[in-house]
């Protein structure tokens, strides 16, 4: 016992010392401090970076011809550098920008290691269809968006990966289309084929029918003479401007219940069924610059109607609005009817049928002798709705906006359709 007593004494004093250290430590002071912004964690986290691949691989993989920003290390910018060939693409790159160059070919080795690519922009180059190696894009299983507009393509590129969601082929020379070229594009939501040489015979096999997710289809400025057949019911936006379409088959739009915007200006439309546009969800309808001679039924949800530059002599309100339902008002707010042959303004009863309307733009009308006239119209003041925001009425910058500015805005911000002319 005498031998163990000093050991117990030593342990006792050691325990007291440790207890006193923790007793005097101010825990509250440590946790009450503000976080240190300069504190660096072991892993250098950065916002807007996909960490599927270690960060150090990103910073070491950019080629000398291009620029890879540190804040977007998965993107490689090679645009506007007078490149004639596609440089080597590192494996980790997901967004590749090669627009505004002088590239003429896309070879099989162009993206051989870049299997993570999600977006490729090859617009504004000199690429021809025969210079695209077969299957070069189909080997990219993660590709979502492909830009090939403003090139020299004569044929629709084929094959393409099933993953593709957005395909832009506008401003080319496409006049050939394989029958099964679009069969595998089951995930495509947007297809732009404007400003090509497409004609009716290329579309007769209902090539768009299997695109069950397609929401936007741009076929403007082609050589179409009839409405494209077999459009998918998922379609929300359809652009057919600047073609030679003269008629619309009855019940054509019955299978397009989701259609939100329809643009058919600069065609040859003449006689159309009066209720052809009776679509449940349509908001914008543009049929200006045609040969229409009379108005048609206005669907309840339509907000913007463009009828300029036709041959309409009278806006028949009975046809436009055959009945008034106080519980379900029409949503029309803007009508453009300039450059027609109207001899008198629309009846003031239009405000009973379309209580939300704030602008009827008459502009100049064409007379029978070829001269232009201005219609004398009464001034109507629309009282603000209860749900109108007060700042819209108090803002002097918005108070004097012209009818053209107020009505020309589209619901899809594409460079083709910024203004209704």
UniProtKB/Swiss-Prot annotation:
One of its GO terms (cellular component) is extracellular exosome. Residues 396-421 have a biased composition (Basic and acidic residues). Transmembrane segments: none annotated. Residues 1-20 form the signal peptide. LRR repeats lie at residues 92-113, 116-129, 142-164, 165-184, 187-210, 213-233, 234-255, 258-280, 281-294, 301-321, 331-353. Glycans are attached at residues 113, 121, 187, 242, 316. May be implicated in biomineralization processes. Has a function in binding of osteoblasts via the alpha(V)beta(3)-integrin. This is Osteomodulin. It comes from Homo sapiens. The lineage of its organism: Eukaryota, Metazoa, Chordata, Craniata, Vertebrata. The gene is OMD.
